[in-house]
């Protein structure tokens, strides 16, 4: 296993307004693999994701990327290393090209049209979209542009938060195939929050089950077919929402 792209949680806690959101989370997201995060709403999944790229800071414990504590990595460096795509796929006003240029502009750099076209190709979008207004894109196209924009910094780690939940079945399958291809082609370490348990099973190499801010069970995604923990069985049976 490549050590440099692993993310290790060591007794990580996060508290907000005296309310524990995450409680002593310990575990490792394996490098170059897709780990799906599942659990009921309010389990702390999005909070955990935000801790991975410094949008939030742990109240206690440590998060290590490779061998380096996240607390010692400057935020701009961290966010270049750990990309994030969200359910809403927010776009700035302007063209697809304007959106793809954004990560470079934030670091006083430029993205050529030729480079931008390569990123569109990576996410299976036609070159004709480059100068189209982002507001005119379909939901699936927006999500692909959002992923392409995240890839501009060539992050070895990619965080995905419910990126297919607002898409129809066909568009969701296309995004799943895309993410699997990106993982295979570039060896990107991917952590993917999903409420779709079927998706978690067939897309993920590994799965973490979170309930009430705790990591209940982790292992190969096949655990969703044969869970060991009672709480996981309850969740999968629909007993925990």
What spans do the regions from the language model cover?
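Helix-to-loop junction immediately C-terminal to a conserved catalytic motif
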Residues: 53
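C-terminal boundary and immediately downstream tail of ABC-type ATPase nucleotide-binding domains
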Residues: 222-241
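Conserved ABC ATPase "signature" region
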Residues: 111-129
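Catalytic Walker B motif of ABC-type/P-loop ATPase nucleotide-binding domains
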Residues: 158-161
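H-loop/switch region of ABC-family ATPase nucleotide-binding domains
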Residues: 194-195
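Conserved ABC ATPase signature
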Residues: 133-137, 141
């Amino acid at each position: 296993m490549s050590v440099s792209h692993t993310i290790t949680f060591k007794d990580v806690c996060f508290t907000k307004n005296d309310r524990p959101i995450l409680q002593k989370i310990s575990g490792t997201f394996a490098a170059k693999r897709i780990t799906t995060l599942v659990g009921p709403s309010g389990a702390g999944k999005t909070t955990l994701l935000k801790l991975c790229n410094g949008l939030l800071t742990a109240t206690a414990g440590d998060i290590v990327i490779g061998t380096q504590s996240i607390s010692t990595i400057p935020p701009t460096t961290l966010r270049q290393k750990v990309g994030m795509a969200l359910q809403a796929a927010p776009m700035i006003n302007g063209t697809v090209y304007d959106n793809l240029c954004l990560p470079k502009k934030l670091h006083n750099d430029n993205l050529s049209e030729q480079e931008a076209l390569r990123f569109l190709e990576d996410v299976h979008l036609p070159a004709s979209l480059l100068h189209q207004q982002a507001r005119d894109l379909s939901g699936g196209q927006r999500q692909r542009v959002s992923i392409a924009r995240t890839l501009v910094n060539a992050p070895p780690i990619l965080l995905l938060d419910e990126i297919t939940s607002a898409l129809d079945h066909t568009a969701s399958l296309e995004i799943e195939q895309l993410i699997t291809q990106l993982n295979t082609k570039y060896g990107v370490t991917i952590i993917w929050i999903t409420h779709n348990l079927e998706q978690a099973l067939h897309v993920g190499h590994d799965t973490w089950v979170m309930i009430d801010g705790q990591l209940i069970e982790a292992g190969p995604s096949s655990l969703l077919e044969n869970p060991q923990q009672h709480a996981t069985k309850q969740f999968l049976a629909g007993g925990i929402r």
